[in-house]
Structure formats: C-alpha cells, structure tokens
Amino acid sequence: MSVNSNAYDAGIMGLKGKDFADQFFADENQVVHESDTVVLVLKKSDEINTFIEEILLTDYKKNVNPTVNVEDRAGYWWIKANGKIEVDCDEISELLGRQFNVYDFLVDVSSTIGRAYTLGNKFTITSELMGLDRKLEDYHA
C-alpha cells in the first residue's frame, strides 16, 4: 500500500482479491466517515500540463495546500487534496501568454469528487457545504 494517504492506491484501494473483500466488508468499514477530501481528474492537454507543472506542483502545493497529490494516469491527471483545490485561470493565461478562461479549463475537467463551482475566472472544488459551512461568495459583491 502507498504511504501517501492521498495516493490513488492508498488504503484499501491498494489491496487485491480476498484481501480487498475482507477489508471492505469488515465491521469497522461499514460506518460512513466524514471526509474533507476532494478529487479533480483532468484530461491531459498542453494547457493542463502547464498548469500541473508550473502552478500546482510548485507554488500551489508549497504555499497554498501541501496535501495536494498529483498522479499521472495515462491520458489524465488525478489530483487529490484535503479541503479544496482552486484553479485561477488568469494565472494559467499569464503562463500561456494567451487568453485562457474558466470555460476553456472546464473542457478538460473529466471528473470531480466534492462541490465544484466557478466564480469569475476561477474554478474551485471544495469539501465545504456552500451556504452552510461558509457564506456564499458573489462575483459582483
């Protein structure tokens, strides 16, 4: 099993066959546990590769959310983190030297686990209950 708790094959997902079944159906695993984990799966493209390499794995992981874990899954990037993942498409646009907006980004979003929303030119996936855990944001406010 993987050491990183946010790895793709962490925990029970690293088990196979009977070992997986025994762990999956164990009494202690029949209870729903609260989680603040979010997942973002992105289709690989030049723009997304730039975002992963130049923003997410450097400044973002170091200064914003150190729990971010990125795995190369053939044609996709599998990203898992605790709390939230926020993508500022203005930063990507600046890196690319051309316009890149949140709708361009959404074309490459394959799957998510969490609550996803856009606000302005930012895409966010969060574990928070929007409107309950914290006040809803308004782009025009």
UniProtKB/Swiss-Prot annotation:
Range of residues in the leader sequence: none
Keywords, ordered alphabetically: Monooxygenase, Oxidoreductase
InterPro entries documented for this protein: MethMoxRegMmoB, MOase_MmoB_DmpM, mOase_MmoB_DmpM_sf
Top-level taxonomic group: Bacteria
MF terms in GO: monooxygenase activity
Quaternary structure annotation from Swiss-Prot or TrEMBL: The soluble methane monooxygenase (sMMO) consists of four components A/MMOH (composed of alpha/MmoX, beta/MmoY and gamma/MmoZ), B/MMOB (MmoB), C/MMOR (MmoC) and D/MMOD (MmoD).
Job description of the protein: The B protein acts as a regulator of electron flow through the soluble mmo complex, switching the enzyme from an oxidase to a hydroxylase in the presence of the substrate.
Family: Belongs to the TmoD/XamoD family.
Name of the featured protein: Methane monooxygenase regulatory protein B
Source organism of the structure: Methylococcus capsulatus (strain ATCC 33009 / NCIMB 11132 / Bath)
